[in-house]
A protein has these predicted regions:
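A contiguous, mid-protein "functional segment" used to position or interact
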Residues: 101-138
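Short amphipathic alpha-helical segments
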Residues: 3-7, 62-67, 106, 110, ...
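A generic structural motif
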Residues: 56-60, 97-106
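Short, highly charged C-terminal tails/helix-capping segments
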Residues: 126-159
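Ser/Thr-rich, low-complexity intrinsically disordered terminal regions
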Residues: 20-40, 45-51
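Amphipathic alpha-helical segments
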Residues: 1-18
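Short, internal acidic amphipathic alpha-helical interface segments
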Residues: 53-94
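Short solvent-exposed loop/turn micro-motifs enriched in small/polar/acidic residues
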Residues: 12, 22, 34-36, 75-78
Length: 159
């Protein structure tokens, strides 16, 4: 059986992902998305488990209860990771995998899950937790003739 670091090294070498190895046990991987252009995910090899930690979005400005309800409902059907908040209220995807279970297929499934959950939840989380900021940004751009291209997904909040 390969050591977890060797498995992760082999996986990253065979996939077109941007990453850096912070130290011998920590890999910082940038996953490309669509709604959320990039998701930064850390894989951290511990004594007994591989920790997964990916930033999703900062602390919501409003409707925190609705945001948390959304996250808890999503958690019920997710594979190997779950939404969590840190001490600042920022939202992350977190998980643990026993070191004995670390193989390339599982790393692929976990990184795929991180990407899918972060990307598919990004716009709904923005709508729930930042709708006032989106409306202000829309008005500001319209008043200055700025592009609304990256706000088009939220047009229904304005009209």
């Amino acid at each position: 059986m390969l050591e977890p670091a060797a498995v992760i090294d082999d996986f990253l070498a065979s996939h077109d992902l941007n990453y850096e190895q912070k130290d011998e046990n920590t890999y910082l991987i940038t996953l490309p998305g669509e709604a959320k252009q990039q998701t930064h995910c850390a894989l951290i090899i511990g004594d007994h488990s591989l920790r997964i930690n990916a930033f999703v979005i900062r602390k919501p400005d409003e409707n925190k209860e609705k945001v948390y309800e959304y996250l808890l409902n999503k958690n019920a059907s997710m594979y190997s990771i779950a939404f969590a908040i840190n001490e600042l209220g920022d939202i992350y995807l977190v998980g643990r995998l026993p070191l004995k279970a670390v193989n390339e297929q599982e790393i692929d499934r976990i990184l795929g899950a991180v990407l899918q959950y972060a990307d598919s939840s990004f716009n709904p989380l923005l709508e729930l937790g930042f709708s006032s900021a989106i409306r202000r940004e829309w008005a500001w751009r319209v008043s200055r003739g700025e592009s609304l291209a990256n706000l088009k997904a939220f047009e229904h909040l304005i009209l």
